[in-house]
Swiss-Prot record:
Residues 206-216 are cytoplasmic. It comes from Schizosaccharomyces pombe (strain 972 / ATCC 24843). Belongs to the EMP24/GP25L family. Its main location: endoplasmic reticulum. It is found in: Endoplasmic reticulum membrane; Golgi apparatus membrane. Residues 34-150 form the GOLD domain. Pfam families: EMP24_GP25L. It comes from the Eukaryota. The gene is erv25. This is Endoplasmic reticulum vesicle protein 25. GO terms for cellular component: COPII-coated ER to Golgi transport vesicle; endoplasmic reticulum; endoplasmic reticulum membrane; endoplasmic reticulum-Golgi intermediate compartment; Golgi apparatus; Golgi membrane. It is a single-pass type I membrane protein. Constituent of COPII-coated endoplasmic reticulum-derived transport vesicles. Required for efficient transport of a subset of secretory proteins to the Golgi. Facilitates retrograde transport from the Golgi to the endoplasmic reticulum. The chain crosses the membrane at residues 185-205. GO terms for biological process: endoplasmic reticulum to Golgi vesicle-mediated transport; Golgi organization; intracellular protein transport.
Length: 216
């Protein structure tokens, strides 16, 4: 029974675990546009971002990284990313995280297709980022108990993401309904204005023709 339960938990964790690992190139420009990645993070979660980049000092490029959220908070800002970097921070409220990179040519460097930095990014959040081995030792938990706690945390993350998406959908729906109402009111106002204008034009022309004795 214990083996079956543990196997089921491992299967569940395999389904719930999402590997956030990306490899990409960022070309160096004199006036570069930000290259951004976006990820939802639930409230009260630990976030760990690991970077590994190519390049070296004096290669004519300066790669910078900034991590912000949809509430306007800045969680990390690194002006010269070289080699391996690791950033860890806590997120108090549910938000969309933006991880943005800029690769800028240093003064005097010539822009070319060979001027670029290759980046390997690993992004872990919540249950992925928590150290359950340390938690297991600190609380004298059985391996299956640690797996259960991890599965529970994953489920809470998924619930948080669903609630966030539902709230965002409701907000968009309310915005659409408000916009539709405004468009409808504007259409009514336009129709009434045109109707009044037509009546006024008819009365004006009637008065004009009467003054010219063209109609009785």
């Amino acid at each position: 029974m214990m083996v079956s339960l543990k196997s089921s938990l491992f299967f569940m964790l395999a389904l719930l675990t999402v590997v956030h690992a990306l490899n990409f190139d960022i070309p160096a420009k004199t006036n570069p546009e930000p290259f951004c990645l976006r990820e939802y993070v639930g409230e009260k979660n630990l976030v760990i971002v690991n970077l590994k980049t190519t390049g070296n000092m004096g290669d004519g490029q300066t790669l910078s990284m900034m991590i912000t959220d949809s509430s306007g908070n800045t969680h990390s800002s690194i002006q010269n990313v070289l080699g391996e970097k690791s950033v860890a921070f806590d997120v108090d409220a549910s938000a969309m995280l933006d991880i943005c990179f800029l690769n800028t040519l240093t003064p005097g460097a010539i822009e070319s297709e060979h001027k670029k930095r290759s980046v390997k990014l690993e992004f872990t959040v919540g249950a992925d980022a928590d150290d359950y081995s340390s938690l297991q030792k600190a609380n004298n938990l059985e391996p299956v108990e640690a797996d259960i706690r991890r599965a529970r945390d994953f489920i809470e993350e998924i619930k948080g993401k669903i609630y966030y998406l539902q709230a965002r959908e409701a907000r968009f729906r309310n915005t659409n309904e408000s916009t539709n109402e405004r468009v409808k009111n504007f259409a009514y106002l336009t129709f009434i204005s045109l109707f009044v204008l037509v009546i006024w034009q008819i009365l004006y022309l009637r008065s004009f023709f009467q003054r010219k004795h063209l109609i009785p």
